[in-house]
Amino acid sequence: MTAFWGEVIGTMLLIIFGAGVCAGVNLKKSLSFQSGWIVVVFGWGLGVAMAAYAVGGISGAHLNPALTIALAFVGDFPWKEVPVYIAAQMIGAIIGAVIIYLHYLPHWKSTDDPAAKLGVFSTGPSIPHTFANVLSEVIGTFVLVLGILAIGANQFTEGLNPLIVGFLIVAIGISLGGTTGYAINPARDLGPRIAHAFLPIPGKGSSNWKYAWVPVVGPILGGSFGGVFYNAAFKGHITSSFWIVSVILVVVLLGLYVYTKSHSAKTLSNSKYI
């Protein structure tokens, strides 16, 4: 099997486990209906671990465009392979989402809430706030990439690394995931969101495209900074990439902060005349 198909299958498995647990929690008449956030984060964490066990020896089990880009910045992955991996991850994520749709086929009609249906496929903020939502994804993915690189630098019992990474996902979900649903992976959010848009889900409502850029841009920025920060802080390698990524991150976050603040002020001003 090629690395391309390894990423397709690995990401498909990740979404089957992750979106599957979200479906079980969100959709009515599921035996795990309303079982809670802890179930969700453990489902995603174990899903990452199982997918990594399945294809780690084939593709390295990136399963995440933000991680692929971060590894390229670190120098552990060739830039020419980045588009191939990202394409594979997107394909796998869409396939995984379609499989979950089919698996829970009779449950869609039993669930009235369009937001609950969308929540099976993609993330959304608990409080819509552009700057804070992007920052949450930046921080979560920064911690993810930093953690993965640190785990990779340590010696564990052979075969234990994927499980440790799975628990890293759980830890991030418990501590940081409550704000945006912690996408921390552009393919994990965008692929299933695309599937949600074209699948014939009864009463599904909007795919919330106005938010879709947040779990793409945030993780890419956070993951990239996590990679160059690890090289600088842990290895002492401060390259031009570190400064480029740092400047882009600061400029984007400052721009979003100013935009969000001005938009909030305008909304408040308009509300006075209602």
Swiss-Prot record:
Residue positions of motif NPA 2: 185-187
GO CC terms in record: plasma membrane
Gene Ontology MF terms in the entry: glycerol channel activity
Record keyword Ubl conjugation present: no
Keyword Transmembrane in record: yes
Renumbered ranges of motif NPA 1: 64-66
Induction details: Requires glycerol 3-phosphate and the GlpP product; repressed by glucose.
Alphabetic keyword roster: Cell membrane, Membrane, Transmembrane, Transmembrane helix, Transport
Gene Ontology biological process terms in this record: glycerol transmembrane transport
Transmembrane feature ranges: 3-23, 38-58, 82-102, 131-151, 164-184, 238-258
Membrane topology designation: Multi-pass membrane protein
Reactions accelerated catalytically: glycerol(in) = glycerol(out)
Domain of life: Bacteria
Alphabetical list of InterPro entries matching this protein: Aquaporin-like, MIP, MIP/Aquaporin, MIP_CS
Primary localisation category: membrane
PROSITE patterns in the record: MIP (PS00221)
Localization in the cell: Cell membrane
NCBIfam families recorded: MIP (TIGR00861)
Role this protein plays: Mediates glycerol diffusion across the cytoplasmic membrane via a pore-type mechanism.
Family: Belongs to the MIP/aquaporin (TC 1.A.8) family.
Domain notes: Aquaporins contain two tandem repeats each containing three membrane-spanning domains and a pore-forming loop with the signature motif Asn-Pro-Ala (NPA).
Name of the protein this chain belongs to: Glycerol uptake facilitator protein
Source organism of this protein record: Bacillus subtilis (strain 168)
Lineage of the species this protein comes from: Bacteria, Bacillati, Bacillota, Bacilli, Bacillales
Gene symbol of the encoding locus: glpF
